[in-house]
Structure formats: structure tokens, C-alpha cells
From Swiss-Prot:
Name recorded for this polypeptide: Adenine phosphoribosyltransferase 2
NCBIfam families to which the protein is assigned, alphabetical: PRK02304.1-5
Pathway(s) this gene product operates in, as recorded in its UniProt entry: Purine metabolism; AMP biosynthesis via salvage pathway; AMP from adenine: step 1/1
Catalytic activity: AMP + diphosphate = 5-phospho-alpha-D-ribose 1-diphosphate + adenine
Gene coding for it: APT2
Record's function text: Catalyzes a salvage reaction resulting in the formation of AMP, that is energically less costly than de novo synthesis. May lack catalytic activity.
GO biological process: adenine salvage; AMP salvage; purine ribonucleoside salvage
Residues passing through the membrane, by range: none
Compartment(s) of residence: Cytoplasm
Principal location: cytoplasm
GO MF, any single term: AMP binding
Gene3D superfamilies referenced in this protein's UniProt entry, alphabetically: 3.40.50.2020
EC identifiers of the protein: 2.4.2.7
Provenance organism: Saccharomyces cerevisiae (strain ATCC 204508 / S288c)
Length: 181
């Protein structure tokens, strides 16, 4: 068993499940206990870092873009570990300055994401990170926002992919996930 496989098993045991959250009929996969455990959090970042260095090499990735809310929790640590920049993708009204925006539907309501226009230079290479890939709508919107400013998405990286929802079918770049369910 590789180190990454061993780490994935440890990470999986830390997830907590909440039934009927955020809406009735849904099961929420909570990865916050991982961040509360420094050893597991380091293993999470190490697993992503190792994967990205093996796949792309340090010179090819320019930015990690973290999707609000949970992508903002581990994205900066991953960017720091890789020695690249970090860019937050936030809900409307959370970022100062000129922002690009996109409106999308999530579950039963519309949301708007924004990103500062000057945060990612034209032609940059970006990896998008978030905790869970479900239907793919949130990740798709984040990717569309990054493409609006002329950057390239190398990959979408997730802690967990809910395979039964086929979210990867909406995405135009490869995905990587530590766990699948």
C-alpha cells in the first residue's frame, strides 16, 4: 500500500455524515474533523501535493483556486506547500475591487460566485480545489469564472467524489479525488 493510499484510509475514517442536511433527503459529508486534527490535515495536504507534483511538476501550476467555503480551508495550505499563489472564489459581496461573477443554481436556489479580476493573470494554469464533488454545478461555475479571465484549468481536485451523482460529467478538465463514495 502506498503512502497516499494509507493516508486516504485515515482521512476517510475522519469524515462525519449528517442525514437531512442541508435539506431533507440529503446526506452531508463533513470533512471538518480532518482540519481539526493537525496530523490528518498535514496528510491531506501531502496527498494532494504529491499527486500534483507527480502529474504536473512544480513549474506548470501557477495558482490553486479554492471554492467557498471548504476549498478556502485547505486551498491556501496546499498552495503554500506547492509554492504557488492562492485565489479565493467567494460568494457575491465578499471580495473588494473589480470582480468577475457567475450565477448558477445550487440545490434549490441561485448563487453567485465572484473572483477578483486581477487575481489570476491571463494564460495562467490553475487547479481548482473543494471538499466534495456532488452534482458538479459549483465546480463548473468556478471553472467558468476562471475561464472568464483567460486562465486554464489543469484539474479539479476534491477530498471526496460522490460517484453516484456523476458531477465529473459537467467538468471540462480532469478530476482527482482522494476518496470516492
Amino acid at each position: 500500500m502506498s503512502i497516499s493510499e494509507s493516508y486516504a484510509k485515515e482521512i476517510k475514517t475522519a469524515f462525519r455524515q449528517f442525514t437531512d442536511f442541508p435539506i431533507e433527503g440529503e446526506q452531508f459529508e463533513d470533512f471538518l474533523p480532518i482540519i481539526g486534527n493537525p496530523t490528518l490535515f498535514q496528510k491531506l495536504v501531502h496527498t494532494f501535493k504529491t499527486h500534483l507534483e507527480e502529474k504536473f511538476g512544480k513549474e506548470k501550476i501557477d495558482f490553486i483556486a479554492g471554492i467557498e467555503a471548504r476549498g478556502l480551508l485547505f486551498g491556501p495550505s496546499l498552495a503554500l506547500a506547492l509554492g504557488v499563489g492562492f485565489v479565493p472564489i467567494r460568494r457575491v459581496g465578499k471580495l473588494p475591487g473589480e470582480c468577475a461573477s457567475i450565477t448558477f443554481t445550487k440545490l434549490d436556489h441561485e448563487e453567485i460566485f465572484e473572483m477578483q479580476v486581477e487575481a489570476i493573470p491571463f494564460d495562467s494554469n490553475v487547479v481548482v480545489v473543494d471538499d466534495v464533488l456532488a452534482t458538479g454545478g459549483t465546480a463548473y461555475a468556478a471553472g467558468d469564472l476562471i475561464r472568464q479571465v483567460g486562465a486554464h484549468i489543469l484539474e479539479y481536485d476534491f477530498v471526496l467524489v460522490l460517484d453516484s451523482l456523476h458531477g465529473e460529467e459537467k467538468l471540462s478538465a480532469p478530476i482527482f479525488s482522494i476518496l470516492h463514495s
